[in-house]
Amino acid sequence: MALKSKPGIMNITPGSKISVIRSKRVIQANTISSCDIIISDGKISSVLAWGKHVTSGAKLLDVGDLVVMAGIIDPHVHVNEPGRTDWEGYRTATLAAAAGGITAIVDMPLNSLPPTTSVTNFHTKLQAAKRQCYVDVAFWGGVIPDNQVELIPMLQAGVAGFKCFLINSGVPEFPHVSVTDLHTAMSELQGTNSVLLFHAELEIAKPAPEIGDSTLYQTFLDSRPDDMEIAAVQLVADLCQQYKVRCHIVHLSSAQSLTIIRKAKEAGAPLTVETTHHYLSLSSEHIPPGATYFKCCPPVRGHRNKEALWNALLQGHIDMVVSDHSPCTPDLKLLKEGDYMKAWGGISSLQFGLPLFWTSARTRGFSLTDVSQLLSSNTAKLCGLGIVKEPLKWVMMLIWSSGILTKSFRCKKMIFITRISSPHIWDSFFKEKSWLLLFEGLLFISKGSMLPNQLENLFLYTLWSLVKPVHPVHPIIRKNLPHI
C-alpha cells in the first residue's frame, strides 16, 4: 500500500522505505519539473512524468508542491574531533547538518588535535569519525610550512583537497604559510587536479591603530580592514594564474576584493570563491557592544558590503555559499568581558543555512535552481563529491517548503543540535521551514524526528587521486570502516 495517496508529509515517519517520490517541483540542473522519481536499491532508476508511475504496491511519497532537490553539501565545517570535541564533534555536527537539509559535509583540517596535515593524522581523524556520522563526511587536508612531502600521500589516502592560512590561524599546530611555502606546495599540486583553499587575509604594513574600546565591535572591525583581504586575494589570483592549480577563496567577506576575482576568472584562472551565510545575513551596524558571539575572521562588515556580496552572488562572481561552522566553548568567547579583541572568532550556523539563505535570497531575484546550484551543485564540484553524488542519482535528497510563510520564529537554544550554540545571532532572521531527508531510499528525518540507526547507512568519503593522470574513483570506505 502506498505510504501516501495525497500530497503531504504529516504521516510519514522516519524509517519508512520509499520507492516513488512524486513532486510538482523537482530540480534537475537548471530546470524545475513535475516528476515521479523511481528509487531502486538506494538509487534513482528513472524519472518519469508526474503521475505516470502506477505500479501496484509502490511506496509512494507524494509531496505535492514541496521542492525536491539534491541534498545540500557544505564544504566548510570545523568538526574539531578528536582533541577539541568539547567544541564540536562528529555526532553533534552531523546531526545538526541533517536537521538543516545537509547530506554531506567536508571537515576542515584544523582545530582538531591532531590537524589533518599528514597521512597519519588523517587516519586518526577517520578513526575518530567511525560510527558517529549522521550524514556523509569528506575531509580537507592542510598545507602548513614544511609538510609538502605529505601532500601527494594525503591525496592518495583520500583527502578532497587542501586548506592553508595566509595569516595566523589562531591555533599553534596549524601555522600559516609564507609565499615561499605556497610556491613549494603549488608546485607539488600541479597536474593533480587537486584544489588549494585559502584563508585569504594578509598582514599588511599599516600605522598602529589607536587602542579603542575592545567591547565595541568597530574596534575589532578596524583591526581587520578590507585591505587585508584585498592583498591576500591578489596574491591568490596571481599564484592561481601562474601555476594553473585550482584555487578557492574561503569565506570571502570584503566586497572590495571582487574586482580582482572577476579579472582573474576572465583571464582563465581556475579560481572559485565562497561566502557565508553570516556575511549575507549580518551587518556590522547592528552588532551590539560585548556581543562576542558575532566575532569571526574575516569580520562581518557593513550593510553596503553585504548587499555588494549578494549582488556578486547573483552575477556569478561568487560561486557558492557555505556555513563556515566554527564553534568553540563559551569560555573562549569571553562573554562576561565582552572583549572582541581577545575572544575566539567563529560562528555556528550549520543547521540554519537553508532558511537563512532562502529567506533573503528570494527577495533579491534568486530562484530555486539558484539554491540548488549555490548550496549543492557547485559545492559538490569544489570538493570532488560531484563524482559520487551526482544530483538525483544517489538518493541523498532534500524535500522542503519554499513557500512564503508569515510565521517567523526566535532561535531558541533548545532547537540547536550542535554541541555549542549561539542562539542570539539568529533571532528573528528567518521563517520556519519543514523538510524531509532521504538517504538511499530510507526516510531519515521528518519534521525534526530522526531515524536512530542512520549511522549504518553512510559513507566516509576518501577520494583517490593519482598524480599523472588524475583518476578519481568512488568512495571506498563504508561508514563502518571495517578495514581501518
Curated annotation (Swiss-Prot):
What is the name of the gene encoding this protein? ALN
Q: Describe, from its UniProt entry, the tissues in which this protein is expressed.
A: Liver and kidney.
State its cofactor. Zn(2+)
Q: How is the cofactor bound?
A: Binds 2 Zn(2+) ions per subunit.
Q: Which family does it belong to?
A: Belongs to the metallo-dependent hydrolases superfamily. Allantoinase family.
| Annotated organism of origin | Aquarana catesbeiana
- Its GO biological process terms? allantoin catabolic process; purine nucleobase catabolic process
Keywords (A to Z) from UniProt: Hydrolase, Metal-binding, Mitochondrion, Transit peptide, Zinc
Reaction catalysed by this chain?
Answer: (S)-allantoin + H2O = allantoate + H(+)
**A GO molecular-function annotation:** allantoinase activity
Which Pfam family, any one of them, does this sequence belong to? Amidohydro_1
Q: How is it modified after translation?
A: Carboxylation allows a single lysine to coordinate two zinc ions.
Residues with the modification N6-carboxylysine, per the entry, are: 163
Pathway-wise, it operates in: Nitrogen metabolism; (S)-allantoin degradation; allantoate from (S)-allantoin: step 1/1
Q: How does it assemble?
A: Homotetramer.
Protein name, UniProt field: Allantoinase, mitochondrial
Q: Where in the cell is it found?
A: Mitochondrion
Q: Give the E.C. number(s).
A: 3.5.2.5
Q: Where does Zn(2+) 1 bind?
A: 76, 78, 163, 324
Give the UniProt entry's GO cellular component terms.
mitochondrion
Annotated residues for binding of Zn(2+) 2 = 163, 199, 251
Q: Is Transit peptide one of the keywords UniProt gives this record?
A: yes
